[in-house]
Amino acid sequence: MIHSRLIIIGSGPSGYTAAIYASRALLHPLLFEGFFSGISGGQLMTTTEVENFPGFPEGILGPKLMNNMKEQAVRFGTKTLAQDIISVDFSVRPFILKSKEETYSCDACIIATGASAKRLEIPGAGNDEFWQKGVTACAVCDGASPIFKNKDLYVIGGGDSALEEALYLTRYGSHVYVVHRRDKLRASKAMEARAQNNEKITFLWNSEIVKISGDSIVRSVDIKNVQTQEITTREAAGVFFAIGHKPNTDFLGGQLTLDESGYIVTEKGTSKTSVPGVFAAGDVQDKYYRQAVTSAGSGCIAALDAERFLG
């Protein structure tokens, strides 16, 4: 069994920032990059241009930003492993963590496994198709991209998050279409009224996108009316999934307190979870903001909390 004083599960802005702070505090953390969001390094590894992370006035590629963070953490003494932690035991001290390759133990643990955007299996939406080439799951992250400016954009969903995305996208697109397979929304009445009163938003009821097409970027969508089965093709520059996120917490086996949506519950103003010595950072405990910079900040908090815990 391999022991480390501090193990960080997950990478991305929260995991790497936690590692930078922890390694500078001479905690010699072991970081499992993992593939919880589908790729080692988190969701930013599938993002092209990141324009809202401080310090990069011209923007920076998502993979470049993550590689920079990783290099910084490693330079200060973090050891990284490209493995997934598949199970944990927080009932014993030191904590026991298992990957497919090895068993590890630690005195403190930071969970930074993120949350994965729920996606529909639509032709054209895959990672090797138009994902991050016009198809995305974060309007705030990607909406200002030049490929969306003054173009027709489509949001899939019917809840508050879908309408928030649609309202945000009206700043950039020429028109925003909300595609919903039912004839009424799940969103709050106040949010629905705001969207209904926005002349740049149109609702496509009883409809679903069945195909996304383009060349190097998205150019069109096929939309099916679920009642008549009629399919129409429309010009489109962007398709935004707004059907929720799933926090990557299944591997915890119910050992930490989660909220009703599966996010890790932390003590207000800290990264402390329901188990002393276990801390959470990033999107795995943040259902509201989900930004690279807020994730990085929470990673810093988790490292400082872990340092104080370890003494």
Curated annotation (Swiss-Prot):
One MF term in the entry's GO annotations: thioredoxin-disulfide reductase (NADPH) activity
GO process annotations (BP): removal of superoxide radicals
Primary location class: cytoplasm
Compartment annotation: Cytoplasm
Pfam hit, one: Pyr_redox_2
Gene Ontology CC annotations of this record: cytoplasm
Disulfide feature: 138-141
InterPro entries from the UniProt entry: FAD/NAD-bd_sf, FAD/NAD-binding_dom, Ferredoxin-NADP_redctase_2, Pyr_nucl-diS_OxRdtase_2_AS, Thioredox_Rdtase
Database matches in PROSITE patterns: PYRIDINE_REDOX_2
Cofactor: binding details: Binds 1 FAD per subunit.
Keywords, comma-separated and alphabetical: Cytoplasm, Disulfide bond, FAD, Flavoprotein, NADP, Oxidoreductase, Redox-active center
Record-linked Gene3D superfamilies: FAD/NAD(P)-binding domain (3.50.50.60)
NCBIfam families per the UniProt record, alphabetical: TRX_reduct (TIGR01292)
Protein name: Thioredoxin reductase
Organism per entry: Chlamydia pneumoniae (Chlamydophila pneumoniae)
Organism taxonomic ancestry: Bacteria, Pseudomonadati, Chlamydiota, Chlamydiia, Chlamydiales
